[in-house]
């Protein structure tokens, strides 16, 4: 996939994190080159392992102008399956959650509170509902803000994570375990003893170069 090599930084913006994690620097740069696209086998594992290892990876979105934006993942939550009372699939399949019961490596997108789209990737064995919710990428914190920034809606639900779908994940540099924080998931107080499980994984995004990287298209 030949692309032209460009390298410019054109703007800087600082925003305050709602959780006080960091004041993030948002820059834009143009570059060439592709990293390794994560295959379904990467996701065909326990959701907590996948969530942890997604930190530092790149979420890529194909824009209408054929440019591709790369955003570094810094926060994700794991939902482990039918025994996890915070998991959408613990009561069985429905029209809304049926994507969770499919094969690993597919997007699961649903509407929360009637207004915010949530972006998840299906993990684990087909037939057992498990997924990882993406909560923070680049300079954007919060799953609703994330999908709004990316332009993600229901059209991605059930699509495989691959360039042809317009939304995929590429391998990053990895994050040392000592830099990863674990906390209970957000907004799952209804899930009894599962509400306190430390299945939210995050790193301070200041450890990354938080630029939004733009590549020319295919």
PLM regions: where:
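Conserved, well-structured core segments that form or line functional sites
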Residues: 2-218
